[in-house]
């Protein structure tokens, strides 16, 4: 069925309350877009934080009376009577079928393949991760996920513990386990992400080696040999003290979700604790990695 999309631009401080207002006025879903860091907003592990210039996007049934919705929203104190908005008609497509048709097995590095659970694996002898993430979570098709998977493939993970900070579908944690890690920890704010990660881990036979935490329930004393966080440049900078504390001394850190022109500002947030490797780039995106400095 077709849909109507309503887009509002606001500050990070007001975005959550405006999202609630859209839901109260008929939206079937609300998403957030950080206008500067990434075209797709992913909530931070730990809490829902939004940054400076944020778009709030409501999705409505095509039969919705949008004039009535706008009239109701004009009564919201944070918006006022002449708030700036954009209404768009979305094409009627079978989005799930189109997504499934376009998701093919993909190779990352020398050993690793990410394969849709409904397709045959190209190389049975490779390290194959069978994935059925649903529409909401990562599949490996985005350059940032690809950069992270290639990095994991390049590491010797035998006997290691890996933390996937913002696990989504669980793709990175599961890949780490299939590549030899002994234990992986996935953290996410979204219960659906935790369930998707659990389902995918079970599908790949690694569930007993994966521990999953809703961010609010994450232990404060976690540490591991390898930490990977594929989120956004803004939260990577903001959460540097938290993320930087997770690797053990001598442990490895991988960060992505970063545009190439944002790399330097992210690096500056981590140079006090890490020796940073050369930046890896793909298209307009990049990955930052480094080794945690051992303290005396």
Swiss-Prot record:
GO-annotated biological processes: methylation
The record's subcellular location field reads: Cytoplasm
Q: Catalytic activity, per the record? A: L-lysyl-[protein] + 3 S-adenosyl-L-methionine = N(6),N(6),N(6)-trimethyl-L-lysyl-[protein] + 3 S-adenosyl-L-homocysteine + 3 H(+)
One Pfam family name is PrmA
Enumerate the UniProt keywords alphabetically.
Answer: Cytoplasm, Methyltransferase, S-adenosyl-L-methionine, Transferase
Query: What's the EC number here?
Result: 2.1.1.-
**InterPro entries (alphabetical):** Ribosomal_L11_MeTrfase_PrmA (IPR050078), Ribosomal_PrmA_MeTrfase (IPR004498), SAM-dependent_MTases_sf (IPR029063)
Q: Where does S-adenosyl-L-methionine bind?
A: 145, 166, 188, 230
Q: Does the keyword Transferase apply?
A: yes
What GO molecular function annotations does the UniProt record carry, in alphabetical order? Answer: protein-lysine N-methyltransferase activity
Q: Which GO terms describe its cellular component?
A: cytosol
Protein function: Methylates ribosomal protein L11.
The record's comment on protein family reads: Belongs to the methyltransferase superfamily. PrmA family.
| Name assigned to this protein | Ribosomal protein L11 methyltransferase
Please report the organism this UniProt entry assigns to the protein. Photorhabdus laumondii subsp. laumondii (strain DSM 15139 / CIP 105565 / TT01)
Q: What is the lineage of its organism?
A: Bacteria, Pseudomonadati, Pseudomonadota, Gammaproteobacteria, Enterobacterales
């Amino acid at each position: 069925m077709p849909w109507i999309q309503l887009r509002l631009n606001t500050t990070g401080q007001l975005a959550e309350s405006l999202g609630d207002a859209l839901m109260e006025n008929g939206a079937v879903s609300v998403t957030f877009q950080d206008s500067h860091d990434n075209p797709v907003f992913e909530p931070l592990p730990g809490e829902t934080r939004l940054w400076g210039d944020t778009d709030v996007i409501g999705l409505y049934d095509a039969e919705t009376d949008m004039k009535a919705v706008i009239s109701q929203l004009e009564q919201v104190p944070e918006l006022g009577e002449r708030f700036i908005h954009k209404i768009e008609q979305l094409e009627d497509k079978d989005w799930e079928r189109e997504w499934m048709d376009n998701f093919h097995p993909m190779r990352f590095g020398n050993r690793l393949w990410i394969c849709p659970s409904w397709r045959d694996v190209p190389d049975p002898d490779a390290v194959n991760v069978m994935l059925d993430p649903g529409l909401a979570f990562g599949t490996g098709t985005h350059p940032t996920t690809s950069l992270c998977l290639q990095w994991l493939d390049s590491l010797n993970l035998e006997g290691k513990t890996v933390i996937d900070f913002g696990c989504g579908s669980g793709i990175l944690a599961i890949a780490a386990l299939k590549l030899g890690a002994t234990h992986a920890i996935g953290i996410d704010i979204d219960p659906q992400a935790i369930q998707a990660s659990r389902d995918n881990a079970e599908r790949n036979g690694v569930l007993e080696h994966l521990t999953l935490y809703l961010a609010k329930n994450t232990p404060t004393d976690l540490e591991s040999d390898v930490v990977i966080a594929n989120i956004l440049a803004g939260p990577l900078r903001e959460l540097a003290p938290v993320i930087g504390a997770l690797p053990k001394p001598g442990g490895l850190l991988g960060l992505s979700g970063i545009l190439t022109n944002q790399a330097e500002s992210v690096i500056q947030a981590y140079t006090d604790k890490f020796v940073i490797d050369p930046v890896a780039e793909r298209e307009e995106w990049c990955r930052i990695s480094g080794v945690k400095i051992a303290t005396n």
